Amino acid sequence: MSPLLRRLLLAVLLQLAPAQAPVSQPDAPGHQKKVVSWIDVYARATCQPREVVVPLNMELMGTVAKQLVPSCVTVQRCGGCCPDDGLECVPTGQHQVRMQILMIQYPSSQLGEMSLEEHSQCECRPKKRESAVKPDRASTPHHRPQPRSVPGWDPAPGAPSPADITHPTPAPGPSAHAAPSAASALTPGPATAAADAAASSVVKGGA
């Protein structure tokens, strides 16, 4: 056998070896487990129109129908993953599709038509950020705060409000250096007591 033929036979055996290897599957013996390739997983998850189930009560806000048959329909809407967290899958092409829906309202029912939106093209675009507009303090006029209302206050016409009523400031109390009171003025001091004693002794000596 020539070396070239040996190499070809070895290559064929290497290719057939993984396919002939036994696969252990307790739940399904004799069946090889199917693995979805990465390219298929990525293609299925990309941003594209896909069939989704939409409840009719969310599409028809304010409908008087008591019951809709069917209660939900399938339409093509954009969905899927974007390569960046700052992007979102949004529709770039849409059209209207009309469907027949049975509207039941006791005791009668009728077959009607309704228009639903379907997406035909999708694209990943930056997410819309809600800009928080803060008012400029310099441009905002300053308003004087209004006085708080007093419970039970019923002002008469022309009467001042409780916030406009001013109370007199109480006079300051006596200080430490204030003049002595009347009681302390009547109390004799040491010099006065000595003069009174001398006067009484003179009176006694003269007697």
UniProtKB/Swiss-Prot annotation:
Compartments reported by the entry: Secreted
Compositionally biased spans, kind Basic and acidic residues: 124-139
Cystines in this chain: 47-89, 78-122, 82-124
Region (Disordered): 124-207
Gene Ontology MF, one: chemoattractant activity
Membrane-crossing residue ranges in chain numbering: none
Cross-referenced PROSITE patterns: PDGF_1, PDGF_2
PTM comment text: VEGF-B186 is O-glycosylated.
Comp. bias (Low complexity): 174-201
First-listed, main subcellular location of the protein, grouped into a coarse class: secreted
Stretch forming the signal peptide: 1-21
InterPro entries, A to Z: Cystine-knot_cytokine, PD_growth_factor_CS, PDGF/VEGF_dom, PDGF/VEGF_growth_factor
Subunit text: Homodimer; disulfide-linked. Can also form heterodimer with VEGF.
Protein task: Growth factor for endothelial cells. VEGF-B167 binds heparin and neuropilin-1 whereas the binding to neuropilin-1 of VEGF-B186 is regulated by proteolysis.
UniProt record similarity statement: Belongs to the PDGF/VEGF growth factor family.
Protein name: Vascular endothelial growth factor B
Protein's organism: Bos taurus (Bovine)
Gene assigned in the entry: VEGFB
